[in-house]
Amino acid sequence: MSKKKVMVGMSGGIDSSVTAYMLQNEGYEVEGIYLKLHNRTDGYHEKNLGYIEDVAKFLNIKYYILDLADKFSKEVYDYFVDSYLTGTTPNPCVKCNRQIKFGAMLDFAKQHGASYLATGHYAKTDGKFFYEADDKTKDQSYFLSQVDKDALKYMMFPLSTYKKEDIVKFGAKLDVAYKKITEKSESQEICFVETVYTDVVKKHANIDQEGDVLDENGKVVGKHKGFAHYTIGKRRGFTVKGAQEPHFVTKLNPKDNTIVVGKKEALEVNEVVGNNLNMFIDDTKFSCNVKLRYRSVSTPCEVQIKDEKAYITLKEPVYGVAKGQLAVFYHEEKVIGSAWIESTK
């Protein structure tokens, strides 16, 4: 008896291409989905679809092109731009995973008879929780922590126990269709940002307006090139008169286009409040480790959930925590929930 149908989110990259091969090799009926999330005119989609076409021919599978550009624009792109214009630091990949990949794409897969949706993410799931991947340098559990818990039972991550370098080596030997993919450059971290984030924001607002740099007492100590060019913890791109040691951005004030700077100790954070929780456990008070940005070291903390907010008390200080980023709660390698950072002190 043949195994169930799995749809694979295919990007034209090596991870999703090997994922499709692995699942077919295990006996699943495999079909692909390519997400068209924006209307780039630089050949981006054409290149990706060329790679997917070659892989689909090798595997003898069909694939769909799912145009979610409008939904992506409203729910991810606009949020990204608005965040920088309101002085917070966005995480578009987290939004995309919840709303687009494991929201709309999962709905599409189920409507087309798939029992599962697989992707080339480096993470693990048992249908109830996410866990860190074995390759900690590529682990993407942080970005998945806002996905609706009802979606987990449909999700598969075949690469969860592999190292990225092994997937690349494996793909290069598999077929010429895969070898071509391994020879192209890695895709950029945020698919719609071709160079730097400010190039995207500049399309929607004049962010190149000089403003005052303030010290922690509100005194003008220098100039900057426009608040949207800065994020919390940044130490370059502004002047501080008479400074003998590095100064860091500690606060952004969009209303009057000022930024506040201070020495490293001014970035110290001991408490965090988070909103828009996505919890995989029911406890309202617990100890765990928290990651306050991707690729950061996790920090031991106490968490209390009250009035739909997470009150996080860190057991050791963390420096440079930005509003708008995600606090992800871990128990060892298991993701037990997450919350968007609203305030710090």
From Swiss-Prot:
Q: What is its main location?
A: cytoplasm
Where in the chain is the site Interaction with tRNA? 121, 325
Where on this chain does ATP bind?
A: 9-16, 35, 120
Task: Report the SS bond pairs.
Answer: 96-191
Q: Does the keyword Cytoplasm apply?
A: yes
> Per its UniProt record, what Gene3D superfamilies does this chain match?
Adenine nucleotide alpha hydrolases-like domains (2.30.30.280), HUPs (3.40.50.620), Translation factors (2.40.30.10)
Q: Which GO terms describe its cellular component?
A: cytoplasm
- This chain belongs to the protein called tRNA-specific 2-thiouridylase MnmA 1
Q: Which organism is it from?
A: Aliarcobacter butzleri (strain RM4018)
The coding gene here is mnmA1
